[in-house]
Design a protein with these regions (language model features):
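Conserved catalytic or metal-liganding residues and their short signature motifs at active sites
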Residues: 1-205, 252-255, 259-267, 275-299
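Short glycine/proline-rich, acidic loop/turn segments that cap or connect secondary-structure elements
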Residues: 225-234, 258-268
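Short, glycine/charged-rich beta-strand-loop motifs at protein surfaces that mediate ligand recognition
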Residues: 241-248
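Short acidic (Asp/Glu) and glycine-rich catalytic loops that position anionic groups and cofactors
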Residues: 173-174, 234-238, 271-273
Length: 299
């Protein structure tokens, strides 16, 4: 039997959806076969089920979507949003909560195979973005564990041979993938942005990726980066520092990870947004870069 669509809704739901849309997401509430589906951002379907018991009375299944490129803080905000929707729309109070989720992402003792020698401050980069099913009894550590399992499965499809030939570690590739995820909106550009990063690392040039500065200073996408922030020395200021950032700046999907391991074979050193504010111009010439930069000033 389908739920009654005419049931009165709280005023918090439209307001919450407005917040989600404000983050550049497409957020919807849809009645699935059972439970609630909160969608957005084009994340891949994982088919993962977190904390779903095989015994006892059936529990209503809820669904949470983490889009590619979300940071762990954005994922925690998504957990909070889903909790509100579950309570307001279904009268369910999930065990998941944003504070416990962030705390769980601070624990780095059980990193996936291939990353055992890495000692990051948190699980940024390892929280695989996908769709996850859960019940009201699912805990935050269980959800994070499921994300780590999904990451390990996805990472098994990444061929590291070329990256290793360039003396890059798996963690280096993950960091590059997180940058690609933040910079690219057009899928065919992933390997091109990866090539620019590889080429700049080879030449000893700063990467100059402003998304790293946003991450380091926790600047929202709706807010401009200040000139003082661009000029300040900071571990995540890739305009000032040569090399990769200390950690990933987002949680990338499989396509970005594969591109980071296998860049295009081009000599590009620069990329800048086109006037459409989505795709990029790519060039090996500083002169051309400066010319193209003037065209994309509004982005």
């Amino acid at each position: 039997m389908r739920p009654d669509y005419r049931r009165r809704r709280s005023g918090r739901i439209p307001a919450l959806l407005g917040v989600l849309v404000g983050f550049g997401l497409v957020a919807t509430i849809a009645w699935a076969v059972v439970g609630i589906s909160v969608g957005g951002g084009g994340a891949a379907e994982s088919g993962s089920s977190t904390g779903l018991a095989d015994t006892g009375p059936p529990k209503e299944i809820l669904r949470i979507v983490f889009p590619e490129g979300f940071t762990r803080k954005e994922m925690a905000r998504r957990v909070a949003a889903v909790n509100v929707i579950a309570e307001e729309e279904r009268g369910i109070v999930p065990s998941l909560n944003p504070k416990a989720y962030l705390a769980a992402t601070d624990r780095t003792r059980n990193l996936p195979a291939g990353f055992k020698n890495v000692h990051p401050p948190n699980l940024e980069g390892f929280l695989f973005p996908a769709t996850y099913d859960f019940t009201e009894d699912t805990t935050s550590p269980q959800l994070v564990s499921d994300q780590l399992d999904a990451f390990e499965h996805a990472w098994s499809e990444v061929d590291m041979e070329y990256a290793r030939s360039k003396r890059l570690t798996p963690y280096d590739v993950l960091i590059i993938a997180s940058m690609i995820e933040e910079e690219v909106q057009v899928p065919r550009e992933r390997t091109l942005v990866a090539a620019v990063i590889y080429n700049r690392l080879r030449e000893g040039m700063p990467l100059g990726i402003d998304a790293t500065i946003r991450y380091g200073y926790d600047i929202p996408p709706t807010q401009a980066i200040l000139e003082s922030q661009l000029e300040r020395d900071h571990p995540y200021n890739t305009r000032k520092r040569i090399g990769l950032t200390p950690t990933p700046i987002s949680n990338p999907g499989l396509a970005a990870m594969q591109a980071a391991a296998h860049p295009a074979k081009v000599d590009y050193l620069y990329f800048v947004r086109k006037p459409d504010c989505k795709s990029h111009y790519f060039t090996a010439s500083l002169r051309e870069f400066n010319h193209y930069s003037r065209q994309g000033l509004l982005c």
